[in-house]
Amino acid sequence: MSKDQIPVENLTELEASSELAFLAAELARHDALYHGKDAPEISDADYDALKRRNDAIEAAFPALVRADSPSKKVGFTPLPTFAPIVHARPMLSLDNTFSEEDLRDFVSSVYRFLGHLPDDSIAFTAEPKIDGLSMSIRYENRKLKTAATRGDGTTGENVTANIRTIKEIPNELPADAPDVVEVRGEVYMAKSDFLALNAQMEADGKQTYVNPRNTASGSLRQLDANVTAKRKLRFFAYALGEVSNGGQPARIADTQYGIVEKFREWGFPVNPLMKRFTSAQQLLEHYNEIGVARPDLDYDIDGVVYKVDRLDLQERLGFRSRSPRWATAHKFPAEQAFTTVENIEIQVGRTGALTPVARLTPITVGGVVVTNATLHNADYIEGIGNSGERIRPEDHDIRIGDTVIVQRAGDVIPQVLDVLLEKRAAGAAKYVFPEKCPVCGSHAVRERNEKTGKLDSVTRCTGGFVCRAQAVEHLKHFVSRNAFDIEGLGTKQIDFFFESDDPALSIKTAPDIFTLKARQEASHLTKLENIDGFGKVSVKKLFDAIDARRAIDLHRLIFALGIRHVGETTAKLLARSYGTYEHFEKAMKAAADPASDAWAELNSIDGIGEVVARAIIEFYKEPRNLDVIDRLIRELQPKEAEKPSTEGSPVAGKTVVFTGSLEKFTRDEAKARAESLGAKVAGSVSKKTDILVAGPGAGSKLAKATELGVQTMDEDEWLALIGG
């Protein structure tokens, strides 16, 4: 992974985009090792930390969410060894919760989404999260028909023969069971059975197994079911997939708790620690009780799962791309360890951010050898958080030679939590943060926030385009997959061209890419085709690929510019709104005047808030940016943006504002429905507003809409307009 880690809140658009690309590839690799080969390289806590980092970046930069995002995936593509089975209902994973605050946020989000429900009126179930292998067992006419692993959430592996060897799983259901029912749960190996198996393996002179989870997964994937039968696998049932009678959807209970009780009646093992509560405090207390009992359980668990109990509320809450809104997994804390800070090195990020990294005496944390830990910024070294609060006692600054507590949780690189002062060497010098960039030697400064007057927590290099650490990353972003995506011009090639000072080869800014062919043709000395790694055919392909990108989609061009806060989705919004690059650039220059119509129009675009708008305007106010763009546009023919078709929609292309207390749907539901019909939902009323939907308590927005002559309607009229 990249070493120049900085806190999510301090990432720039380019830094976030690059790290999301890394995380997508890294998580996919670990998924393949964990789900496909049962040979993980990292602990569950480390994997969760990677996912948390990915999710945190996506939450901070929603416009950068990738098509191959780990947040859209579940599990791993099924292996070809087993026949595939398509799940009748997807087997989604759960979002993770790591703290009391996260838990309370989850409960609050449920109430917020449902709306108009009194406190403590929603019941939640809480049960141990079994560290095993998720399974869906399908019964037809009450007989076990098939069994499939989760796989990628849509398609799993057919392990029916192996599942039949697990004695705890019924081969037939009672007469009151529906015609079709999918029972979902976790296959696991008990700790006692695992120890006995390893003892036998050792006695036989064979290699022992690493842990119960991997052993259970490997045992279930045996091609010979007789091997599986000898492994003493077990099962806990906890959820339903498809349920139907006579081809029509059916229910066996109205609550999650009732489903588990029905499983018990049918003969399935269910977890005895599952309970039902109505407050976040009760859930937290049960979480702590399970944590205390954890060492004495005969099975591995890595957290507690909370679910909204009523199935009708689950249906209203629905799903995100890969997880339900009505459930979360509260994970247990990661492990900590003690080690020594051997050195503190400075890494320079893509926009000049100077990030200190502690080089540590190697130590094993959670089954992984740790040698580095992020120190975030100068304040963190001193024990001060990003909001200015003290996170460690005043004399607990981090120094070279200190013995420190390291934890792997919540970040890709481990964090140094605290210092053991009693082990600090006499005369240990305080760490002095550098005042110059270690890459280019330019001054490094902490900018002052114009609104708050506070110093930024991040120290940045002022070198700009003269600093290699920044300029080369701008180029890599420009040619990245969601930007210009030029075949044959990847990160390795960009490094080569950027490092060259030969006028016939050098690429320092984006326009240089499109003049490379002409410079090569004019050169009598340096020919790219004669350089190692290139050839006549590959050079021709590269030039053809560059020429093919001269006619570029408008949203790709806008995204490629690397404007802070402008990701792929935001770029598409801007492209659809302005149509052509000429119109876009002209509008951005005009929007520098906050009293202008251009400023109002920019802010009215759904998804473009004031922070994004100001970042775009500041970008177009910088003369050096305009110089690069002018040279770039002379080499391109940007395409006009295509406008989406929403044929038949009465609100397609209209700008809609919702205000007041909505009673028939939540604000999120209203926005989602309007956008699905092609409407643009804005947060404020302007001359561009077409419809104002006003609920009880509508105030200034209704008054302004009336003043501007905007069409207004109540919820019933809105529902009648869009067809309910």
UniProtKB/Swiss-Prot annotation:
A Pfam family assignment: HHH_2
Residues of the active site: K129
Cofactor(s) it depends on: Mg(2+); Mn(2+)
Reaction(s) this enzyme catalyzes, per UniProt: NAD(+) + (deoxyribonucleotide)n-3'-hydroxyl + 5'-phospho-(deoxyribonucleotide)m = (deoxyribonucleotide)n+m + AMP + beta-nicotinamide D-nucleotide
Transmembrane segments: none
GO cellular component: cytosol
Binding-site residues for NAD(+), renumbered to this chain: D44, A45, D46, Y47, D48, S93, L94, E127, R150, E186, K307, K331
Database matches in SMART domains: BRCT, HhH1, LIGANc
Entry EC number(s): 6.5.1.2
Residues covered by the BRCT domain: 646-724
A GO biological process held by the record: DNA replication
GO molecular function annotations of the record: DNA binding; DNA ligase (NAD+) activity; metal ion binding
The entry's keywords: DNA damage, DNA repair, DNA replication, Ligase, Magnesium, Manganese, Metal-binding, NAD, Zinc
Binding site for Zn(2+): C437, C440, C461, C467
Xref: NCBIfam families: dnlj (TIGR00575), PRK07956.1 (NF005932)
Functional note: DNA ligase that catalyzes the formation of phosphodiester linkages between 5'-phosphoryl and 3'-hydroxyl groups in double-stranded DNA using NAD as a coenzyme and as the energy source for the reaction. It is essential for DNA replication and repair of damaged DNA.
Family indicated by similarity: Belongs to the NAD-dependent DNA ligase family. LigA subfamily.
Entry protein name: DNA ligase
Gene this chain is encoded by: ligA
